Amino acid sequence: MILFLHNRYRTTGGEERVVEDLAWLVRERIGEDVELLERSSEDLGSRRAALGLLRGGIDPQEVALAVRARGARVLHAHNLQPSFGWRALAAARAAGARVVLHLHQYRLVCAVGVCFTRGEECTRCHGRNTLPGLRLNCRGSRPEAAAYAASLGLWQRRIVQQADLVIVPSEFARERLRALDAPLPWERVHVLAPPLRGLDLAPPPPLPPAGPASYALVVSRLAPEKGVDVAIDACRAAGITLLVAGDGPERGALEARAVQGRGVAGADVRFLGRVDDRELARLRAQASIALVPSRSAETFGLAAAEAMAAGLPVVASRVGALPELVEQEGLVAPGDPLALAGAVERLAGDRDAAARGLARVRAACAPEAVAGALAELYDRARST
């Protein structure tokens, strides 16, 4: 039996989807029982969150009880902050479980997890030196920034010491964490791409040809590091409608930017907010191209992978792990709307590019392949 551990973020994002898909994979493809022990940052409150960070976790005995009650042999830990911390992992080990630590982001070193602040990529925090995050107030709240800086400096080594093995989503993520002096046991750090359930289904419908009804699609949390403003400017230059699915702190500013371009032929921008899976599938089926204009060093690029799995050509920034997934023709410099516009004009409606992308993402994220690799990692953890 595998017990998943995850502290949900205030704003739901790709990591929550990956956790859900991995739980599905364990149950349906590996054939093991799986349960999720979950807490939510939204429910904690600032005082209790700070307590969890500074103490290295709240109520670790809840985790120990769950391990014993369910007979879990492996604890698969995802986001631990602010409520679980290293004490949850130690409690699981004491109760008899082996620990697999899954680092979806850079949160072991970076207080915001994405190595991005004040409009640019940032790698100032290294190892236990997390003071730059406090000085720059990366969390947007001095008390919160102080709590994260102290917690990372105090407890990051304790977290790692509890892990029998560590999973990261890409080669780039592993090397970035190494460059950040993350105190990881590198011989036990393994790369595992997330599974995409959609790749188990029928092939995606044929890509609609580019034409007056064409639109580009961005599926993203609306935050500065995601570069949605670049997509707005690029689609305005390319004369193609842009649909934006997602929400976040930058929505108001992005809507204002889009209003400035109204009246330009073909430059309509529509903000759809969060959409459910069924609506997202419909949007992808009718789009001509998907854009992933990130400014930050993505640890994987889930939005790109899901669009490729849906049969869309993808244009993405040449940052982070995106070049491991997206072919060279679909990569552009981050923050360059004219380069992005040019790629949109070349690739919108390109069925050959879509077919190549589908083949690439199948090689990386097919559920059967990911299941085999994950089952082997669980066996390694059990044998330590």
Please provide the spans of the model-predicted regions.
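A conserved mid-protein helix/loop that constitutes part of the nucleotide-sugar donor-binding site
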Residues: 16-17, 214-237, 249-253, 338
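Conserved acidic donor-binding segment of nucleotide-sugar-dependent glycosyltransferases
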Residues: 329-338, 344-350
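Short alpha-helical segment that forms part of, or immediately flanks, the ligand-binding pocket
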Residues: 281, 299, 304-309, 323-324
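A charged, aromatic-enriched C-terminal amphipathic alpha-helix characteristic of glycosyltransferases
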Residues: 349-379
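Nucleotide-activated donor-binding/catalytic signature segment of Leloir-type glycosyltransferases, i.e.
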Residues: 255-278
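Donor nucleotide-sugar binding/catalytic pocket of nucleotide-sugar-dependent glycosyltransferases
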Residues: 127-202
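Short alpha-helical donor nucleotide-sugar binding micro-motif in glycosyltransferases
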Residues: 274-275, 282-287
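Acidic donor-binding loop of glycosyltransferase active sites
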Residues: 285-299, 312
